[in-house]
Every structure is written in C-alpha cells, then in structure tokens.
Amino acid sequence: MSRNDARYLRCTAALGAAFFACGAAAAELTSPPVAPATEGVAAGLSPWQIRVRGLGVLTEDSGSINGVPGSDLSYSDSLIPELDISYFFTDNIAAELILGTTYANIKEVGAVGVPVGKAWLLPPTLTLQYHFTDFGAFKPYLGAGINYSLFYNQSEKAGFHDLDVDNHVGAALQVGFDYMVDEHWGVNFDVKKIFLETEWKADHDVLGPLSGKAKIDPWLIGAGVTYRF
C-alpha cells in the first residue's frame, strides 16, 4: 500500500467515524421516550403473529438397508406452502409453531438402485426464539426447539410391499429475519435445520423382508409474508 493510499484510508475512516458519531447523537436527540421496562410486548401490538411462506424442503441423501453392503437411500426435495403461528412473551422472546405437510420419494441408490416408495410427512416444529430489536424495521432472530415427524399415506413402487417409516422426534435449529414494512406487515426469510434419522421397513418380492435407517435431516428454507396482530 502506498503512503497516499494509507493517508486516504485514514481520512476515510475518520470521516466515517465522525458521521457515525453524528448519526448516533441525532438518533438520541430524536428518539421517542423509552417504554417502561415493565412492558412485556410492544405497546399497541397483540402478542400473536402469523406468517405464510413458500418452503423449500431440501433433504440430505443418506440411509441404508440392513445386511446389504453399499446400500444407500435418496429422497426427493419439494416446494410447499407453510403456515406458522408465533406468540411473543416479551418483545424479545417468542414461541413459533410451523404447520405444513410434504412428501418424499424414496429410492435406493447404492447396491440395488431401485425406487422403494413414497411417504407423506407431517413435521410440526415448535421453536423458542430470541428476537433482536435494535435494528429498526430489520428484526433478526435465532431459535431452537423440537420436531415431531409423522409419516403417513405411505405407498410402494413395483416389487415392494408394506412400506413403513417410523415417526421420529428430533431437534430443530433456526435463523431468520422479518423486515417490517409497517407496524403490522412485513416480509420474512427463514432457515431451519431438522435432525431427522429414523427406521424403515418393507417387503420385497425377491429379497424378502428389508429394513434399515433413513437419514433425511432436511433444510427448510422459506420466504413469505408476516402479519403481527
């Protein structure tokens, strides 16, 4: 770096610091009075909030058939509508329940290389969230909680019978943000990681009874609309 470049960077940094200080001082002068510490939820707002999102379900392709070396499983990804309901205990602490249903086509992609079947999945997920409130309309949050994955309406491909995927309880992690357009409406982006590893079994015309593990561990990536009552 040349001496002139270094001088330019120092000047730029000094100007930036000055603007930041002036902006902070102006914010202090123009900020409304701080709400009393006893108020648990923003004044005038209900503790209830809903979101409607489009949700991409991106699975991790991993699994096995017991007793079959080199076996592996893959699962189809999907795009679904999703509803979530949140309740704010305070301005920062909330609980969120997501509701939606999806399906996965299951295929053995290792030693056998054949489609196994299809299973529908209802994965209600409850998370406890911390919402950051220091960034104006931009409201990021972090969450962690529990997922219960309920498999239903399972069907088999040719050669397979009696496919059964066990229901599963697992952990969930979450990060996202709302950008509020006004007091009630906003847009949302949300990412969740669901830890889902379960057991499955089925009968095959040639191979007989089969069983194994299905490690799905999906990413749930959603975007949509927020409404705070």
From Swiss-Prot:
Keyword hit for Signal: yes
SUPFAM superfamilies, sorted: OMPA-like
InterPro entries reported in the protein's UniProt record: OMP/PagP_b-brl, OMPW
Protein's UniProt keywords contain Signal: yes
BP GO annotations: transmembrane transport
Primary localization class, coarse: membrane
Keyword annotations of the record: Cell outer membrane, Membrane, Plasmid, Signal, Transmembrane, Transmembrane beta strand
Family: Belongs to the OmpW/AlkL family.
Protein name according to UniProt: Uncharacterized outer-membrane protein y4mB
Species, as recorded: Sinorhizobium fredii (strain NBRC 101917 / NGR234)
